[in-house]
Amino acid sequence: MKRIGVLTSGGDSPGMNAAIRAVVRKAIFHDIEVYGIYHGYAGLISGHIEKLELGSVGDIIHRGGTKLYTARCPEFKDPEVRLKGIEQLKKHGIEGLVVIGGDGSYQGAKKLTEQGFPCVGVPGTIDNDIPGTDFTIGFDTALNTVIDAIDKIRDTATSHERTYVIEVMGRHAGDIALWAGLADGAETILIPEEKYDMEDVIARLKRGSERGKKHSIIVVAEGVGSAIDIGKHIEEATSFDTRVTVLGHVQRGGSPSAQDRVLASRLGARAVELLIAGNGGRCVGIQNNKLVDHDIIEALAQKHTIDKDMYQLSKELSI
């Protein structure tokens, strides 16, 4: 293999730049040319493809976002559109592709693989919802951003004796909410993977108030439902002074943590190794702190699951 491509797709995550850097430097170390595909699959279709050199990835390992930009591209689901993308890759002499992104990005890589073009997926999403890996690039940074925000909100919640409902990202996965809620001692954590009873939430808050608790923190993953509606329900049922904070896209930004920089470097380099070895149609990950790779089609057939033990622990510690 003499030439590979790299793109980032879907929602950005801190550490994507570190992964791009690793792909470029690892490939050049092995005398392989690297071409960057800008704006994800949309850029692949339009041919926005440029050669990357060592200097192209200098001074980016510590930066959030993605140097290659990103975009969502629903039209890539069309086989004819994907063929246009493959034609662009072949036009530029690209023999293998590294795709950095989340579930939708993996779906695109899977489809390209099924159409005969070798791809390797690298998990880049703050949601931590990709099968085949314990952690995704960006999750740790986002988690620390959320924890810092909740720490600050708890300060004002304590001062004003208020209940705060804090919404974090996670349409289908509650990892950010669960980990942040546990780390910050939240009184209640609501995640998409686990059903909840609003009356039970109310009862828990009232029990806390009866034993002298003056403030509470409730962490809600966005996939559970409207945090605003939850906050209104709590205030109406308890008369507690209640506020709602939606953290939003601040969770996606910022300089990546050391853990995300190292993880991205390891996974990006491993993706190149797989392409060099002729092992396309794979996705890389980390499990028990060891690099692993899986068949991307088989990996996508799996479903992300929450850590049940951690969820149970969060309930036991929030009595």
Swiss-Prot record:
Stretch forming the signal peptide: none
Active site annotation, chain numbering: D127 (proton acceptor)
Domain of life: Bacteria
The reaction(s) this protein catalyses: beta-D-fructose 6-phosphate + ATP = beta-D-fructose 1,6-bisphosphate + ADP + H(+)
Keyword set includes Protein biosynthesis: no
Residues given in the record as ATP binding sites: G11, R72, C73, G102, D103, G104, S105
Modulation of this protein's activity: Allosterically activated by ADP and other diphosphonucleosides, and allosterically inhibited by phosphoenolpyruvate.
Keywords in alphabetical order: Allosteric enzyme, ATP-binding, Cytoplasm, Glycolysis, Kinase, Magnesium, Metal-binding, Nucleotide-binding, Transferase
Cofactor(s) essential for the protein: Mg(2+)
Binding of substrate, residues: T125, I126, D127, R162, M169, G170, R171, E222, R243, H249, V250, Q251, R252
InterPro entries in the record: ATP_PFK, ATP_PFK_prok-type, PFKA_ATP_prok, Phosphofructokinase_CS, Phosphofructokinase_dom, PKF_sf
Gene Ontology molecular function terms on file: 6-phosphofructokinase activity; ATP binding; metal ion binding
First-tier enzyme category under EC: transferase
Positions annotated to bind Mg(2+): D103
Subunit structure comment from the entry: Homotetramer.
NCBIfam families from the UniProt entry: PFKA_ATP, PRK03202.1
Protein name: ATP-dependent 6-phosphofructokinase
Native source organism of the sequence: Bacillus mycoides (strain KBAB4) (Bacillus weihenstephanensis)
Taxonomic lineage of the native organism: Bacteria, Bacillati, Bacillota, Bacilli, Bacillales
